[in-house]
Each structure stands twice: as C-alpha cells, then as structure tokens.
C-alpha cells in the first residue's frame, strides 16, 4: 500500500494535507473498474482506511483549533474517501457474486458523495461523481421496489446541541465544526410503511418475494427453497421479504474489513 500513515499531521501545512489526501483519492480512482484485479482493489480499500483515519485526525486537530472551515473540509474528505472505498467494494462484491451486498455499497457511495458536497464547497467534483453513480445504478442493477417507513416520536432532539430540534438554530444535514446535524427521535414508534419511487434511503427495499418454488431474490433472481414450515398459495396476497429501516446513517464510514473480511495474500 502506498498511502503512508501521517504520524504528525499538525506539522503539515493545510495545503500539504489536502494534497496528500487528494493524491490518495486519485490513486484509488484508477481502480474503479470491474476489470481491475480484486486483490489490488481490496488493497486500495485498505489504503483508503488509512487515508480516512488521517483525515479524521486532522479534522479533530482543526476542531481543537476552533477552525470550523477546516473541520468541515476534512469532514468532506472523510465522506469523499468513504465514497470511493464503497464503490471499490461494490465491484469486489459483484465479482464475488454478492449483489445484495454490492447494492448496499453502491448506495453507501452515493450517500458519501452527497454528504461530501454538503460538508464543504470544495467537493463540487462529488456532484459529478454522484451523477455517474446514479447512471451506474441503472446500468448494473435491475429496477428496485423501494420502501419508506413513517414513525412518530415523543420528541425530536438536535444531535449538535441536544436541545429540541424545533427550538435550536441548527439545520439537519448541515455541517457544524466537523459533524453533520441530525435529528434524534426519542422513543420512536412505527406508524406506516409505503412503497415509494424516491426513498430517503435506497437500502430500504423489497429484497425477495414468494413464488411457488421458493423465495426469489430481486437482484440475483436466485430462488431459496422454503423452510419446512413455509407454504405458498397462489390465491394469497404477495408476500415479500423487505428492509424498511436501517440504523447506520453513514455506511460509507465502515472500514474495509467489516465489509469484505480480512485482506489475504
């Protein structure tokens, strides 16, 4: 791996750190193709783990200096690095014949690009990358049935200040000193689930549906046989397996090993 660990990032100038992070991203982008070696792609993912770690270190240093612009800049780098890493993992997982896991990495890459543009104005290139990923979605994956779940909560709090969201000045999705404002739902309760065309989270979707032969996966189209206690009736309503809620708001931040397993030689 050619991305070194920055032992003392505080001794580097802002330009040096930015150049270092951009160089690591540019090197990884060379491998954004299904034709590239999976082994080399995985090595790049691990290199991006290191790059992300260093971006986080310099972000924390900016926070200690009370430099909000720099903190938000490096938050953007965390998002952009995570997006590239997620896209690399998507290709690896597709080549492993794991389309559902690959779909989640594609969505993570899209979320990372979008968050990078929200974090700081220096990531306009991520807007172009997001459009490319949306095109890639329709070229690689079949159309999906998306779901959206509605919830009610006792109160909504701000993740930045901890106050009621309706009374504070922070805005959801905006960066503040290196972190995004999120709304925390206190004591949430499910209200409804609906099929939608444009979900807030594309990971929420119909995963499989029942056929006379078993559960058919909507991505791989493979059929999993029924368990002994399962039955299928032609006159019944359509039964599906679905995901209608995800807990991880920042899936692109997940390190390589947790998704792909350990790097083997």
Report residues per predicted region.
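Signature of dsDNA virion morphogenesis modules
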Residues: 1-265
């Amino acid at each position: 791996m050619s991305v070194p660990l920055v032992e003392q990032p505080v001794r580097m100038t802002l330009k040096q750190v930015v150049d270092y992070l951009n160089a690591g991203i540019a090197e990884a982008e060379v491998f954004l193709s299904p034709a590239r070696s999976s082994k080399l792609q995985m090595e790049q993912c691990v290199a991006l783990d290191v790059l992300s770690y260093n971006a986080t270190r310099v972000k924390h240093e900016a926070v200690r200096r009370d430099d909000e612009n720099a903190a938000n800049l490096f938050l953007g780098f965390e998002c952009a690095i995570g997006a590239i890493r997620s896209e690399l993992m998507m290709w690896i997982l597709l080549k492993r014949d794991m389309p559902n896991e690959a779909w989640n990495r594609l969505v993570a890459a899209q979320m990372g690009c979008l968050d990078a543009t929200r974090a700081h104005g220096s990531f306009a290139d991520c807007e172009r990358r997001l459009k490319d990923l949306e095109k890639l979605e329709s070229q690689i994956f079949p159309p999906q049935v998306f779901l959206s779940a509605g919830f009610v909560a006792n109160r909504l709090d701000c993740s930045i200040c901890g106050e009621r969201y309706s009374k504070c000045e922070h805005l959801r999705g905006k960066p503040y000193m290196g972190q995004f404002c999120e709304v925390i739902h206190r004591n949430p309760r499910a209200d409804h689930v609906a099929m939608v065309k444009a979900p807030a989270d594309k990971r929420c979707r119909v995963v499989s549906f029942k056929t006379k032969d078993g559960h058919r996966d909507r991505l791989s189209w493979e059929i999993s046989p029924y368990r002994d206690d399962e039955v299928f009736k032609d006159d019944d309503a359509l039964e599906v397996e679905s995901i209608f809620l995800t807990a991880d708001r920042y899936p692109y931040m997940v390190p390589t090993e947790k998704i792909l397993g350990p790097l083997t030689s």
